[in-house]
């Protein structure tokens, strides 16, 4: 079904020459982002950077569906844009053995793209068409909030939801305190009310909790 609130736009190219698409939920008559940005917040979601980690793709499809059918009510100052599948070439390189510890599916894509690049390590160097396309998409959107969806690679995480959030020190005093003390706490409390228990994502590698775990840097 077609919805006038949903746009499906070709906005880049994978290393294999196939297009990268952006899905935009915009319930407003105005479609010019430069105009909308004046009084609207833009949320940008990246999906499928690692094939075999499909949860974010599925969740985004469900979210867009529920927004378009008005099952979910949103504030009247809000637009969502999402890359549907960032690493489409990796998704086409399918097997059943690259994620030995992960429970299903029976077949999935390979972590690297068509040139075997881990795109999660190419945001700054931009050796791939994918990364250069991402930069163009990001500058086109100029989002207020960015989310990059991942899934654990078969590790036994006990919590439903793990996250890496921006280090508050990197945001500056005012924005950093707002994000850490208000925005993030509100999000986590709202998720907990819905039965989703969350915890920061950490790499253990034999460490013990007594000395703490290092925080990830989001760059």
What are these language model-derived features?
Residues 1-219:
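Structured catalytic-domain cores with a bias toward divalent-metal coordination
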């Amino acid at each position: 079904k077609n919805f006038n609130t949903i746009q499906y736009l070709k906005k880049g190219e994978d290393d294999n020459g196939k297009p990268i698409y952006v899905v935009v939920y915009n319930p407003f008559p105005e479609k010019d982002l430069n105009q909308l940005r004046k009084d609207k917040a833009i949320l940008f979601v990246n999906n499928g950077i690692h094939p075999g980690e499909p949860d974010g793709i599925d969740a985004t499809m469900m979210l867009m569906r529920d927004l378009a059918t008005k099952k979910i009510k949103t504030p009247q100052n809000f637009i969502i844009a999402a890359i549907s599948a960032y690493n489409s070439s990796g998704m086409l390189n399918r097997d059943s053995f690259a994620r030995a510890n992960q429970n299903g599916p029976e077949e999935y894509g390979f972590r690297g793209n068509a040139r075997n690049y881990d795109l999660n390590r190419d945001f700054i160097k931009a050796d791939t068409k994918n990364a250069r396309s991402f930069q163009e998409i990001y500058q086109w959107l100029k989002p207020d909030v960015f989310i990059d969806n991942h899934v654990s690679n078969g590790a036994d995480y006990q919590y439903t939801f793990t996250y890496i959030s921006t280090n508050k020190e990197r945001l500056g005093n005012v924005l950093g305190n707002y994000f850490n003390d208000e925005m993030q706490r509100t999000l986590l409390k709202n998720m907990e009310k819905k039965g989703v228990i969350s915890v920061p994502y950490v790499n253990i590698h034999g460490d013990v909790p007594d000395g703490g775990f290092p925080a990830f840097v989001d760059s």
